[in-house]
Amino acid sequence: MIDPAGVDQGDAAMSYATEVRRRLYAGERVYGTMAFEFFTPGLIPLLHAAGCEYVVLDMEHSGVSIETIKQQIAYARGLDVAVWVRVPELRYAAVARVLDAGADGVMVPMLETAEQAKDLVRFARYRPDGERGCAFGMAHDHYRPGDPAAVMQSANQRIVLIALIETVKGIENCAAIMAAPGLDVGWLGHYDLTNDQGITGQFDHPRFVAAAERLAEACRVAGKTAASLDASLDFLRAQAARGYRLLGYGQDIAVLRAGYSQGLRALRDFA
């Protein structure tokens, strides 16, 4: 079985990612963001300096390549920040490639069934917890030689697997999804969920509130973590009160736009 409290055999960066996963299972809150647009060499170091404990790199909406993702992960080496990747779809090649590139975790969008959750675990974890293919001495283990058994055990302890639940069907099945062994996080995709509910962007609507609470409860019962991200602190405050512990501020586009808008409005008031 996967031991979230196990000791990682890798370097400090790998150990930090393992520590993040351990903290999730210990019931602690973890804070970070998601990046859609500004994939520069300084992005992850800047977000780390700002206090992010994790960064999710988006491949669903951003259109970036695996080469860009691999570069971003390399820029994060040596920093105390976990780097997770949202892949565009649930396919073995999509999941395994970002892990081989060195990602500390994978988020899959539009996950709706327990069978899909089990597929994610199977694609992402090495035996005995999954069926991920073996390729050693590559980016994911920092190009170093080592004992394959130790590398696989370390990866299974470090990697965080995230189900992005953002449809009515996903909410209906969320208890079974979160019960899947090896799945760590249920992340609420609130805009897509309200869109599927026919109430796009209405986050105070009783149907959305009920769905958000249902996912939080499913995560609690399964011993997993409920996650949510937005640029609205009021929204995140409400999610935290519901039991969401993996919280994200942003994403990068929203934060940059809001920061410049606020500063320029203030500037125009006196200049």
Regions found by a protein language model. Give the residues of each.
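N-terminal amphipathic alpha-helix/helix-capping segment at the start of soluble metabolic enzymes
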Residues: 10-34, 146-157
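Glycine-rich, proline-tolerant flexible connector loops at the mouths of alpha/beta enzymes
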Residues: 43-44, 52-70, 190-204
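Conserved anion-binding
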Residues: 93, 105-181, 190-195
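Short, well-ordered coil/turn segments that N-cap beta-strands
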Residues: 26-31, 52-53, 77-83, 103-104, ...
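Glycine-rich phosphate-binding active-site loops on the catalytic face of alpha/beta enzymes
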Residues: 107-116, 187-195, 245-262
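Alpha-helix-loop-beta-strand connector modules within alpha/beta enzyme cores
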Residues: 66-87, 92, 96, 125-129, ...
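Active-site mouth loops of central-metabolism enzymes
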Residues: 26-39, 160-172, 225-230
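Short, acidic/polar
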Residues: 36-48, 89-97, 169-179, 231-236
